[in-house]
């Protein structure tokens, strides 16, 4: 089965009214536009999203829905660094340092909390900066992602040479 668009999200439905099968994804797989996966029940699915969300797939995104059957996204828990800033200045410092490493940064549960995938160098940096943090297991859901840049993404436009020798971007 080939999935070309998202249908909605489980949070907008009552999942008890449906038979839900899940595709388990790691946080870093949620930004793939083209991929093959197996559901928990063993169904093969291919994803070729034409209008993929800029932030990536989110927890509960519905990939397939037919009558009472749904296939939805489940983002697996992963090891994360949970960061707790003490001030707005510390938030700026955290965002700068994490961004400078091109690491993913996610909102936490409250205003001054953030999460980033666990990496020893990042943990050492936060310790060196005196930023309060601890390592835990948590979902990194795309809807909570602060950054939308994709350093290795392909351009979304076609460049061609016009007859008047001007570069045209479509």
Swiss-Prot record:
A GO term, aspect molecular function: unfolded protein binding
Key words, A-Z: Chaperone, Cytoplasm, Nickel
Compartment list: Cytoplasm
Major place of residence: cytoplasm
InterPro entries reported in the protein's UniProt record: UreE, UreE_C_dom, UreE_N, UreE_N_sf
Gene Ontology cellular component annotations, sorted alphabetically: cytoplasm
Pfam families per UniProt: UreE_C, UreE_N
GO terms, biological process: protein folding; protein-containing complex assembly; urea metabolic process
HAMAP family: UreE
Entry's family note: Belongs to the UreE family.
Function per UniProt: Involved in urease metallocenter assembly. Binds nickel. Probably functions as a nickel donor during metallocenter assembly.
Protein name: Urease accessory protein UreE
Source organism of this protein record: Helicobacter pylori (strain Shi470)
């Amino acid at each position: 089965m080939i999935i070309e668009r998202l249908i909605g999200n489980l949070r907008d439905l009552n999942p008890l009214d449906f038979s839900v099968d899940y595709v388990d994804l790691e946080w870093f797989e949620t930004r793939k536009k083209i991929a093959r996966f197996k559901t928990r029940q063993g169904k093969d699915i291919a994803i070729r999203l034409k209008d993929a969300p800029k932030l990536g797939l989110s927890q509960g995104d519905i990939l397939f829905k037919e009558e009472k059957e749904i296939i939805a996204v489940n983002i697996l828990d992963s090891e994360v660094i949970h960061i707790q800033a003490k001030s707005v200045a510390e938030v700026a410092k955290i965002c700068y340092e994490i961004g400078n490493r091109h690491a993913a940064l996610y909102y936490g549960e409250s205003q001054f909390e953030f999460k980033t995938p666990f990496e020893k160098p990042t943990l050492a940096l936060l310790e060196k900066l005196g930023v309060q943090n601890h390592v835990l297991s948590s979902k990194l859901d795309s809807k909570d992602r602060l950054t939308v840049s994709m350093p290795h993404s392909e351009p979304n436009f076609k460049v061609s040479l016009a007859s008047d020798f001007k570069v045209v971007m479509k």
